[in-house]
């Protein structure tokens, strides 16, 4: 794993993009990833927590480097009395990953607050994309399809009261702990929400709550999560998610789609 310790796109471009013989992939915090048991071929570039400068453009607009953790950014914004980011503060990911997948929770999504993002293409060209050009939709954007690397994002928020903002952040954190299986390691929400349905409800109705393969288990606390109860392999997780998808399809006719992103050789 290579970390970019300099908060600049030049770090990525000079060390990797200009060297065509190097295979690489870029990750943020890795919180929604499932890595193959065979590992990943080539270099994994992690946009570390030093790649996390914040620039205050005006009273309600900020530019943030992609390595910034959402929790850290949320608390910084709260201290400044900026509201609108509370929904994301408890998501265990980075700004880059959040933009890539249009992360969301508790009624909010990145597309609600983003103005633009600077990205690198595979040739090392820096491109600025507007909110519309990012093609943000439910847990997706053009970033993955075009294989872009998020360098930074601009968010527009609203002025608010610091104490009120922090109280909401705390309230959402309490809800998250009550509803999600945070006592076990996981890659977060495992399946995307099918249109008109809730994945967890479909999985529970199919009788799959608590079902396990090896060390991987459908959480008994929230069926939308596959958790690692101890020494689970990526193969265990894949076998279990395939079983879940098959049984839900048989039971309800709904096709579940993974929200977790697979990296590496799963052949």
Predicted regions and their residues:
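Single conserved hydrophobic/aromatic residue that forms the stacking wall/gate
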Residues: 1-7, 12
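FAD-binding glycine-rich core of flavoenzymes that anchor FAD
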Residues: 9, 19-24, 49-96, 120
């Amino acid at each position: 794993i290579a970390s970019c310790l300099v908060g600049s796109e030049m770090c990525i471009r000079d060390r990797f993009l200009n060297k065509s013989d190097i295979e690489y992939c870029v990750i943020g915090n890795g919180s929604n990833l499932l890595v193959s048991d065979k590992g990943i071929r080539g270099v994994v570039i992690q946009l570390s927590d030093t790649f996390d400068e914040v620039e205050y453009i005006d009273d309600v607009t900020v530019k943030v480097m992609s390595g910034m953790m959402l929790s850290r950014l949320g608390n910084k914004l709260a201290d400044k009395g900026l509201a609108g980011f509370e929904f994301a503060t408890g998501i265990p990911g980075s700004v880059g990953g959040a933009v890539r997948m249009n992360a969301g929770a508790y009624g909010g999504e990145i597309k609600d607050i983003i103005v633009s993002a600077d990205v690198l293409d595979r040739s090392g060209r820096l491109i600025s994309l507007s909110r519309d050009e990012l093609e943000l939709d439910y847990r997706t954007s053009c970033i993955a399809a075009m294989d872009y690397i998020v360098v930074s994002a601009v968010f527009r928020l609203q002025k608010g009261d610091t104490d009120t903002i922090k109280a909401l952040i705390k309230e959402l954190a309490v809800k998250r702990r009550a509803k999600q299986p945070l006592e076990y390691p996981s890659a977060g929400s495992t399946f995307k929400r099918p249109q008109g349905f809730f994945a967890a409800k479909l999985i529970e109705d199919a009788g799959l709550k608590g079902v396990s393969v090896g060390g991987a288990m459908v959480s008994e606390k929230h069926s939308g999560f596959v958790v690692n109860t101890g020494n689970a392999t990526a193969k265990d997780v894949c076998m279990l998610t395939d079983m879940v998808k098959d049984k839900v399809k048989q039971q309800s006719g709904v096709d579940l789609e993974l929200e977790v992103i697979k990296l590496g050789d799963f052949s």
